[in-house]
């Protein structure tokens, strides 16, 4: 294998998506990483048992990357990009995770919290998401139900459901209060998120303290799942319509993201002649774009070959 290029060291230890280009500028591969530097560095490691990757790496002439605010955002960015264009070394259109939403029904008679594959408006019902990874989202719902037993709070509960609600601390809590608590977490309100994670962590530690290790492991999975669904991400927004291009530039490199109906659909980079760094985007996009324009300029100055 060729020596590990200097461009790898320029990548941050942060989640994001990356792509490799050949010397003609063609995109060879798009991937995602929980830690960009470590993941991309692995392509210059031991590939003896990965012949297809060895062939690809001989063609790589440039590295590009988008730093994301979370691993969940990176997963969505990869999925959205691969749905529109499948580079020759990618094998799966869109990715492996199944997109799902969370459905919160706060009706007093039959409140429910669960997964939904589509948004179907109904009185008293809110949808959150979409999220990637049905198993993770199901675990997040389990964790939230553990703290806020909405499904066991209606007046038509069985004796078993009433007992479960009592054990989970929701026996006398009104449905509206439980639903509001769940919505606050899923709306990513900082205090609500911190309180929910702290409560699950306390239960995990208590289970471990009594050597209930399977229960503690399950709680740890629920903690990680709640963190997944509340993680910041802007590259897939439900309900947004219309087209929008957001751009940033610096050091002769311009980064342009094309957003279509709330989803990132194209990621473009090109040289530019603007001497002063800048952005053209709504405020919520500016930090994201600025850091990625700066990274694009650093990587452009460090070709692989």
Regions found by a protein language model. Give the residues of each.
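Conserved catalytic/ligand-binding micro-motifs in nucleotide and anionic cofactor chemistry
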Residues: 1-305
């Amino acid at each position: 294998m060729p020596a590990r290029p200097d461009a790898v060291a320029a990548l941050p230890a942060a989640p994001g998506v990356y792509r490799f280009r050949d010397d003609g500028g063609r995109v060879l591969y798009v991937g995602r990483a929980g830690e960009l530097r470590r993941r991309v560095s692995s392509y210059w490691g031991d590939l003896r048992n990965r012949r297809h990757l060895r062939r690809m790496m001989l063609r790589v002439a440039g590295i590009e990357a988008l730093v994301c605010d979370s691993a969940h955002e990176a997963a969505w960015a990869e999925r959205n990009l691969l749905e529109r264009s499948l580079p020759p070394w990618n094998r799966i259109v869109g990715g492996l995770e199944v997109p799902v939403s969370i459905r919160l029904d706060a009706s007093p008679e039959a409140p429910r919290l669960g997964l939904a594959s589509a948004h179907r408006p109904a009185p008293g019902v809110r949808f959150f998401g979409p999220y990637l990874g049905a198993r993770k989202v199901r675990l997040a719902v389990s964790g939230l139900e553990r703290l806020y037993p909405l499904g066991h709070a209606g007046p038509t509960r069985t004796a078993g459901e009433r007992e479960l609600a009592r054990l989970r601390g929701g026996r006398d809590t009104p449905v509206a209060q439980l639903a509001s608590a769940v919505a606050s977490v899923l709306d990513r309100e900082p205090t609500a998120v911190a309180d929910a994670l702290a409560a699950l962590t306390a239960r995990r530690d208590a289970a471990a303290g009594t050597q209930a290790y399977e229960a503690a492991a399950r709680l740890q999975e629920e903690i990680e799942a709640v963190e997944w669904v509340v993680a910041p991400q802007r590259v897939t927004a439900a309900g947004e319509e219309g087209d929008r291009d957001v751009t940033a530039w610096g050091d002769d490199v311009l980064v342009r993201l094309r957003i279509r109906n709330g989803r990132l659909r194209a990621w473009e980079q090109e040289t530019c002649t603007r001497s002063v760094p800048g952005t053209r985007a709504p405020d919520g996009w500016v930090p994201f774009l600025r850091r990625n324009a700066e990274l694009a300029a650093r990587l452009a100055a460090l070709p692989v070959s």
